[in-house]
């Protein structure tokens, strides 16, 4: 957990007005992904993805930049933090298990049979198709770029985001 990072909904059961419920992964070395390394989308709006949320000056009472040698080591070794660290680990886990992710696709519907997820309907570059599977991982990101969702679920206006532009709430829509 990231101490002192604001809770999005502190008034909800389990909410913490002082923050501390935001989770993050340690940095992940993207070289472990082999040929998949460059297939992970990087936000054009946040160039320093080599840090973790707890290392940003937003989470510090007295802002202190990460030491230059630490940042340079992470850049040299392509060690990424923030959402990149989570995605890198999830992707590595899939690849280790022989699971090949569908990319450049949008999940549009979950197939539900007998009150359980039985697959997913996908819009891909070659059209719509269905994947039936006993397990489905929705790696759809957040909803930063969906103004209807940000207005409904976040406090105050969100005029811009540093997230990847594909964070449009597809998982929540389903």
Region locations from a protein language model:
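Glycine-rich loop(s) and the adjacent beta-strand/alpha-helix scaffold that form part
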Residues: 77-84, 124-127, 131-174
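Conserved redox-cofactor binding core of oxidoreductases
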Residues: 1-126, 147
């Amino acid at each position: 957990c990231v101490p002192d990072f604001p809770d999005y909904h502190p008034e909800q059961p389990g909410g913490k007005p002082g923050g501390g419920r935001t989770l993050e992964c340690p940095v992940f070395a993207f070289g472990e992904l082999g040929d998949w390394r460059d297939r992970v989308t990087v936000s054009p709006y946040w160039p320093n993805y080599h840090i973790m949320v707890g290392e940003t000056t937003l989470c510090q009472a007295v802002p202190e930049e990460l030491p230059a040698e630490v940042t340079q080591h992470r850049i040299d070794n392509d060690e990424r933090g923030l959402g990149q660290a989570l995605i890198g680990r999830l992707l590595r886990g899939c690849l280790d298990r022989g699971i090949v992710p569908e990319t450049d696709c949008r999940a549009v519907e979950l197939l539900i049979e007998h009150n359980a997820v039985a697959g997913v309907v996908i819009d891909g570059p070659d059209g719509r198709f269905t994947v039936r599977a006993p397990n489905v991982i929705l790696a759809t990101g957040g909803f930063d770029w969906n103004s209807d969702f940000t207005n409904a679920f976040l406090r105050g206006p969100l005029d811009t985001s540093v997230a990847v532009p594909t964070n449009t709430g597809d998982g929540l829509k389903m």
